[in-house]
Amino acid sequence: YQKLYGVSSKTPAGWGEISRYYYQFYNTKYVYNPNVKWETTITRNLGFDFGFFKERLSGTVDIYWNTVKDLLVPSDIPGYTGYTKLMTNVGQTSNRGIELQLNAYIVETKDFSLNANFNIGHNKNKIDKLASGEKEWILTSGWNKGLMNADDYRAYVGGTSGLIYGYVNDGFYTVDDFESFDAKSRTWKLKEGVVDSSPLSDTPRPGNAKFKKLTPVDPNSANPYQLTEADRTVIGNTTPKFSGGFGLNATYKGFDLSMFFNFMYDFDVFNANKVMLTTWADNHENNFGMEVASDRRWRNFDDMGNEIRYSPEILAEFNKNATMWNPTSIGKPICMSY
C-alpha cells in the first residue's frame, strides 16, 4: 500500500478537519467523459518474399496503409464548466509507406559463419482530422517554460506530424542596416524597410539577432516592419524521408559478434542545446557554444576591453569577419531556424 498522509514540523497547527491549508491532489484541467472508447487501427498490407541462390540472399517487400480512427484528442470547452479540456474520440491519422528487408548468408562453414542484414523504409504520415471543427493546432514540446512563443510545433488537417514552428533567422544587424546613430542618446535608427526584431531580441543595434518578416507590410501601422507572432512559419520537419538499418553477425567456434547500425535521412532536429548555448537565456554567465566563440561572434568590446559599440566606424571594421550575433542580444530561448 502507499500512505496518503505525512507529518511536517514546518506546518503550524490549523483548525477544522483538514486544517486551513489547501492541497490540490488532482489535475482539474480535463473533465471526465463517459463516452470515450478505444482507438481503432485499420491496417492494409501487401507484401511478398523472395529468395535467390538457395536462399543465401532473401528479402521482403512490404507496402502498407494504416489508419488510426477515433484518436483520443483534447477538445476545448467553455471555461464556465470549471474545466478547459474534454478528451474525445475525434482525431484521425494515416500512414502510408513501403519497407524493404534483405538478408544475406555470406559465409557458412563448420567453424565460421558471417551474415548481413539491411532494411530501409519510407513512411508518409498525414493528419486527417483533429478535434471537432478545428483545422489547426499550435502545440508546445514543453522543453523550456521560458521559451518565447512557447508553442513550437504545428499540426493541421492535411499536414504531417512533427512540423517545427518558429521564426526564420536572418543573421544579425550590421552597421549598414542603420540610417543613423545618435551619439548623445546612443540610439540607432533603422533604415526604411529593415525588419525591426525588437519583440524577440534587444532594441535593434549592430550585432543583435535579426529575423525575417513573412507577413505583408501594413502601411497604416505605426511600425510596419516590426516582427509579430504572425511571422512564424514551419521551419522544419522531424519526420525522416527514409529510415533503416544494417547489421553484421559473425560466429567463430564458441564466439559470436553482432553489430547493428540505424540511420535516418532528410529530417530536421529541434536542437534545444544549440538554442540555449547561443543566447543569453538562462545562461547566467556560464559556457556558450563554439558558434559564439570570440573569433566568430559580434563583439562590442575590443581585445583590450575597450567599449566600441558606440563608434560605428570602429565597430564595423572590428566585426567585419563576424559570422554570429552577440548572444547577449537574446534574453529568452527562441524557436528559430539558422
Q: Residue ranges of each PLM-predicted region?
A:
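Extracellular/periplasmic, surface-exposed regions of secreted and cell-surface proteins
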Residues: Y1-V157, I330-Y338
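Transmembrane beta-strands of outer-membrane beta-barrel proteins
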Residues: L57-G59, L114-A116, F246, Y252, ...
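Active/binding-pocket-proximal capping segment
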Residues: Y64-K69, P78-Y80, F263-F267, K274-W280
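Flexible, glycine-rich loop/tail regions that form catalytic "lids" or insertion modules at the edges
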Residues: Y225-Q226, F246, A272
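Glycine-rich phosphate/pyrophosphate-binding loops
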Residues: Y252-A272
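Membrane-interface anchoring segments and C-terminal beta-barrel signals
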Residues: F270, R299-Y338
